[in-house]
From Swiss-Prot:
Compartments (UniProt record): Secreted
Pfam families for the chain: Toxin_34
A GO term for molecular function: toxin activity
Keywords (A to Z) from UniProt: Secreted
Species of origin: Ctenus ornatus (Brazilian spider)
Functional description taken from the UniProt entry: Not toxic to mice by intracerebroventricular injection.
GO cellular component term of the entry, any: extracellular region
Recorded family membership: Belongs to the neurotoxin 04 (omega-agtx) family. 03 (type II/III omega-agtx) subfamily.
Main location per the UniProt record: secreted
Listed name of the protein: U14-ctenitoxin-Co1c
Tissue: Expressed by the venom gland.
Length: 31
């Protein structure tokens, strides 16, 4: 998946979560 925009939350995609976490783009719940 692609990186999420600033302020957006992941929709359950682990790729988006990983990208989100690594790039500090948003407050993603890591599971």
């Amino acid at each position: 998946g692609s990186c999420l925009e600033l302020g957006e939350y992941c929709n359950g995609s682990k790729d988006d979560c990983q990208c989100c976490r690594d790039n500090a783009y948003c407050g993603c719940d890591i599971f």
